[in-house]
């Protein structure tokens, strides 16, 4: 039978519940347990797919094509279990499901209320999500409840968790509460009162946490831990200090050293093997002792909120680990390139243009593509970054001066990138969309396997085929591919059913390393293995740096 760990947060948001939950999962998995994680989001949106990156940060795409919270990316990076659509749900999905049942008459004319109907539906979603785990029936399901205790939006989820714990019985569920212990510089001390009040608020709704994770910018002294224990009614050994570190991959060891996994296993009556965190220690060792160093420019329009590129940043960090190369990421606002030109790119060892939507800043990104191509600097374009690379090549090499995407200019006569109106989903069913379709759920989403053209750089990186996740509406227009190929561009991978370009590159005679991909490889990168595309990209950046150094010498 699956046991449950509910992770809640207090005082403020963005304390790192996702990292804490993922780290606990990593420790439990290292002890031989099968673990899955779920994220419950209290907003009314059905999913984050149509939310602004400035509001929500990154949208993480699962293998089965769900647009989910970025915390699911952390989950996949920390444990071996893959996430699915069922691992993330929102208030919007819960209410949508309940209203649909009410319309069908499932409630037999009863008054539909938050309790019991909404809370029962939340419990059903939790148990369904745990049961659908890719690892088989999990020993432990860790359920992260989004938001902050005290928020009105989170109340139905907390009430559902309380009811579920009661229903499952003793030693079947436990609660971990993450809270803030701020340091007041003017007073020169840590303050525990916010934590005391947060736990009090949690207890008011019937939940007594078994463990407190106390976030601070420094380790919490024993006397402060004793005070927290006294006023929150949590045993002193269950008041765990979680301080700021320079790498999230240090967190599993930090939590294990303070006995978090022991406390959880004791409460849930689990007796697994001892934890083996040698892999995490080795990763941290490699991360902190690089042999080389490169600077990669990430050109985008969401650079003021790096959470928008969370998986991409982590993928570069994983490549850093596996190439013994420290990767410095320089965030470059593409709109500034439109105004000031590309001189600010001259010191970079490589250029990366990530995915994105909308017209704003695209000409600055195209300028960055042009710079990378002409200066022979390694270039990686992801999703929109590939489309813009094709547009730049069409304009500046092939001579299609009005080449553009219909996303930015619906009336362009040279539609090098356009909306595809019909395609096959992962199950082989035909999906259709138009310019007037809803934004939500009308993209090519999820994993797709594609064969790779022999003799290409793509084959050297991936092998015979590539299986990556997608999130896009627009595609490179096959009508212009013959002209692009005549100019030297290579389409190195295509979808097997629609024959749509999935990867493009420039031959070595034109550029040492220039690759565009329509998919999002960052979603499948893990610290354990890295990712072949990002490792190759970092190695190319290092080679570029060494070539420059040799030329100067």
Swiss-Prot record:
It comes from the Bacteria. L-glutamine binds at residues 356, 384-387, 407, 473. Allosterically activated by GTP, when glutamine is the substrate; GTP has no effect on the reaction when ammonia is the substrate. The allosteric effector GTP functions by stabilizing the protein conformation that binds the tetrahedral intermediate(s) formed during glutamine hydrolysis. Inhibited by the product CTP, via allosteric rather than competitive inhibition. CTP binds at residues 13, 151-153, 191-196, 227. Keywords: ATP-binding, Glutamine amidotransferase, Ligase, Magnesium, Metal-binding, Nucleotide-binding, Pyrimidine biosynthesis. GO terms for molecular function: ATP binding; CTP synthase activity; glutaminase activity; identical protein binding; metal ion binding. Residues 1-270 are annotated as: Amidoligase domain. It catalyses: UTP + L-glutamine + ATP + H2O = CTP + L-glutamate + ADP + phosphate + 2 H(+); L-glutamine + H2O = L-glutamate + NH4(+); UTP + NH4(+) + ATP = CTP + ADP + phosphate + 2 H(+). Pathway: Pyrimidine metabolism; CTP biosynthesis via de novo pathway; CTP from UDP: step 2/2. Its EC number is 6.3.4.2. One of its GO terms (biological process) is 'de novo' CTP biosynthetic process. Residues 295-547 form the Glutamine amidotransferase type-1 domain. Mg(2+) binds at residues 71, 144. The keyword Protein biosynthesis does not apply. ATP binds at residues 14-19, 71. The active site is at 383 (nucleophile), 520, 522. UTP binds at residues 13, 191-196, 227. Disulfide bonds: none annotated. PANTHER family: CTP SYNTHASE, CTP SYNTHASE-RELATED. NCBIfam families: PRK05380.1, PyrG. HAMAP family: PyrG. Belongs to the CTP synthase family. Catalyzes the ATP-dependent amination of UTP to CTP with either L-glutamine or ammonia as the source of nitrogen. Regulates intracellular CTP levels through interactions with the four ribonucleotide triphosphates. This is CTP synthase. The lineage of its organism: Bacteria, Pseudomonadati, Pseudomonadota, Betaproteobacteria, Burkholderiales.
């Amino acid at each position: 039978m699956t046991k449950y760990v509910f992770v809640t947060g207090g005082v403020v948001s963005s304390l790192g519940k996702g990292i804490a939950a993922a780290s606990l999962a990593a420790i439990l998995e290292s002890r031989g347990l099968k673990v899955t994680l779920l994220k419950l989001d209290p907003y009314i949106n059905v999913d984050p797919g149509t939310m602004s990156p400035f509001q929500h940060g990154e949208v993480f795409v699962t293998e089965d094509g769900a647009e989910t919270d970025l915390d699911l990316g952390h989950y996949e990076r920390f444990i071996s279990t893959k996430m699915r659509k069922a691992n993330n749900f929102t208030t919007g999905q819960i209410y949508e499901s309940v209203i649909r049942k009410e319309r069908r008459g499932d409630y037999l004319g009863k008054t539909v209320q938050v309790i019991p109907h909404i809370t029962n539906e939340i419990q059903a979603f939790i148990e369904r999500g745990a049961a659908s785990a890719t690892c088989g029936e999990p020993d432990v399901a860790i359920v992260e409840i989004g938001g902050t205790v005290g928020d009105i939006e989170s109340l139905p989820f907390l009430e559902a968790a309380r009811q579920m714990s009661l229903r499952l019985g003793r030693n079947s569920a436990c609660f971990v509460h993450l809270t803030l212990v701020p340091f007041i510089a003017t007073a020169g001390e840590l303050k525990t009162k916010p934590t005391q009040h947060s736990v009090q608020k949690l207890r008011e709704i019937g939940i007594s946490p078994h463990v407190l994770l106390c976030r601070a910018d420094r380790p919490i002294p024993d006397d402060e831990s004793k005070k927290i224990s006294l006023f929150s009614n949590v045993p002193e050994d269950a008041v765990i200090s979680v301080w700021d570190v320079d790498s999230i991959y240090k967190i599993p060891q930090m939590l294990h050293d303070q006995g978090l996994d022991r406390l959880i296993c004791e409460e849930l009556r689990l007796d697994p093997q001892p934890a083996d965190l040698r892999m995490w220690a080795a990763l941290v060792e490699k991360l902190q002792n690089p042999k080389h160093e490169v600077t990669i420019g990430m050109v985008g329009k969401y650079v003021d909120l790096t959470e928008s590129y969370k998986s991409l940043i982590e993928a570069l960090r994983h490549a850093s680990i596996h190439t013994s190369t420290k990767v410095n990421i320089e965030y470059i606002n593409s709109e500034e390139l439109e105004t000031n030109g590309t001189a600010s790119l001259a010191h970079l060892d490589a250029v990366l243009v990530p995915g994105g939507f909308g017209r704003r800043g695209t000409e600055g990104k195209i300028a960055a593509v042009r710079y990378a191509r002409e200066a022979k600097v390694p270039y990686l374009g992801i999703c929109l970054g590939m489309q813009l690379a094709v547009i730049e090549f069409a304009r500046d090499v092939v001579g299609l001066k009005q080449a553009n995407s219909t996303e930015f200019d619906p009336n362009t006569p040279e539609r090098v990138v356009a909306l595809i109106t019909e395609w096959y989903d992962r199950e082989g069913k035909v999906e259709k969309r138009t310019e007037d379709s809803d934004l939500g759920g009308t993209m090519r989403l999820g994993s797709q396997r594609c064969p790779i053209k022999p003799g290409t750089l793509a084959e050297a990186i991936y092998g015979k085929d590539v299986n990556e996740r997608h999130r896009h509406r627009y595609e490179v227009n096959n009508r212009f591919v013959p002209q692009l190929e005549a100019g030297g561009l290579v389409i190195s991978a295509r979808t097997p059913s629609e024959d749509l370009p999935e990867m493009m590159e420039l031959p070595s005679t034109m550029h040492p390393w220039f690759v565009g991909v329509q998919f999002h490889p960052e979603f499948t990168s893990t610290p354990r293995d890295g990712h072949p595309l990002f490792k190759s990209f970092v190695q190319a950046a290092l080679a570029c740096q060494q070539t420059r150094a040799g030329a100067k010498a």
